[in-house]
């Protein structure tokens, strides 16, 4: 069965194991998520559990949103997402960090930091041209392709907007779970800025 929870990225730090090993970790705060709806094949065409995370003021919600969360007897939520392959939950139930344990392997999804309009060197990692005085280019994208088609092919790597994409990092290890603080420590870095929404769920490609 899949485990899943929504949280917010707090930042990065490091911890030391009992053997003295140094581990860089990302701190993710995941207050209890509330189950707002249980979707079934009969009513919705697929099975999923809809959860809400992070309370917001009622004045910021419209009537349909208030009525939706009222079925779960909870406050309006800022973020609402779905998890599949989660069974045995009813509307109003809570998902907490206690479902995870140290050593679990998870996939972490977030929105990468936006970098604005960037060139091909920063955006795609291309090499720059010769920097000598007589060089005809330094940081330009290079050849646009052969003469024959008289056009630029699709997917040609060019300058453009960078970042702000939905990114999933797979097979990250949970180093520690702190239930009293609703905190999960994940080994390594995860996409997104501080305070951004993070989705944690069981890894789909974990070694069995």
UniProtKB/Swiss-Prot annotation:
GO (cellular component) term, any one: cytosolic large ribosomal subunit
Domain of life: Bacteria
Protein family (similarity comment): Belongs to the universal ribosomal protein uL3 family.
Keyword Ribosomal protein attributed: yes
Cited NCBIfam families: L3_bact
Gene source species: Streptococcus pyogenes serotype M5 (strain Manfredo)
PANTHER family: 50S RIBOSOMAL PROTEIN L3, LARGE RIBOSOMAL SUBUNIT PROTEIN UL3C
Protein function: One of the primary rRNA binding proteins, it binds directly near the 3'-end of the 23S rRNA, where it nucleates assembly of the 50S subunit.
Pfam family, one: Ribosomal_L3
Keywords noted in UniProt: Ribonucleoprotein, Ribosomal protein, RNA-binding, rRNA-binding
Name of the protein described by the UniProt record: Large ribosomal subunit protein uL3
